[in-house]
Amino acid sequence: MNLIPTVIEQTNRGERAYDIYSRLLKDRIIMLGSAIDDNVANSIVSQLLFLEAEDPEKDISIYINSPGGSITAGMAIYDTMQFIKPKVSTICIGMAASMGAFLLAAGEKGKRYALPNSEVMIHQPLGGAQGQATEIEIAAKRILLLRDKLNKVLAERTGQPLEVIERDTDRDNFKSADEALEYGLIDKVLTRNTEDQK
């Protein structure tokens, strides 16, 4: 059962009920709290575009607790984060794994955060293929190209040499918040909610 909390806000015109995600969106906060598929990506991209149209000068925050998911869906979010004018800060709560970790690192440099007990996991893309040999070969070439593309972006976002990223993403590589900071995936481990993260 998916229960979405409702909050009541008092205004001079009376009370107004919001689902919690709509209320957070008013404060320019987007929640990425699930696996990343096309539906999730479309929702996140729509929220980013809406917030840019509302105020292109004001930062946006994305809170991430995600096991990862589809590369193409994640890249749609990544490209939109880079495309829009507002700076996008990212905050890891719980776990940012796979494409979730990639999006965490994709936040505005200096505005990528993690809570102290959160974890980050990076690895190479997962995929599979079936069918005729030529179809399997096409799929294998594509996943290798995607791996190279993701590794290059991670190297640029973290400041790590490409060879280090290639080695470290060869298998599941879990990092604590402090290790993610040292590696360059984030810029600060948050212990208190402060206005400087927005």
UniProtKB/Swiss-Prot annotation:
GO cellular component: cytoplasm; endopeptidase Clp complex
Localization: Cytoplasm
Domain of life where this protein originates: Bacteria
Annotated InterPro entries: ClpP, ClpP/crotonase-like_dom_sf, ClpP/TepA, ClpP_His_AS, ClpP_Ser_AS
Keywords carried by this UniProt record: Cytoplasm, Hydrolase, Protease, Serine protease
Catalytic activity: Hydrolysis of proteins to small peptides in the presence of ATP and magnesium. alpha-casein is the usual test substrate. In the absence of ATP, only oligopeptides shorter than five residues are hydrolyzed (such as succinyl-Leu-Tyr-|-NHMec, and Leu-Tyr-Leu-|-Tyr-Trp, in which cleavage of the -Tyr-|-Leu- and -Tyr-|-Trp bonds also occurs)
Keyword Hydrolase: yes
Pfam families: CLP_protease (PF00574)
GO biological process terms, semicolon-separated: protein quality control for misfolded or incompletely synthesized proteins
Assigned EC number: 3.4.21.92
List of catalytic residues: S98 (nucleophile), H123
Gene Ontology terms for molecular function: ATP-dependent peptidase activity; ATPase binding; serine-type endopeptidase activity
HAMAP family for this protein: ClpP
Subunit field text: Fourteen ClpP subunits assemble into 2 heptameric rings which stack back to back to give a disk-like structure with a central cavity, resembling the structure of eukaryotic proteasomes.
Protein role: Cleaves peptides in various proteins in a process that requires ATP hydrolysis. Has a chymotrypsin-like activity. Plays a major role in the degradation of misfolded proteins.
Family the UniProt entry places it in: Belongs to the peptidase S14 family.
Protein name: ATP-dependent Clp protease proteolytic subunit
Lineage of the species this protein comes from: Bacteria, Bacillati, Bacillota, Bacilli, Bacillales
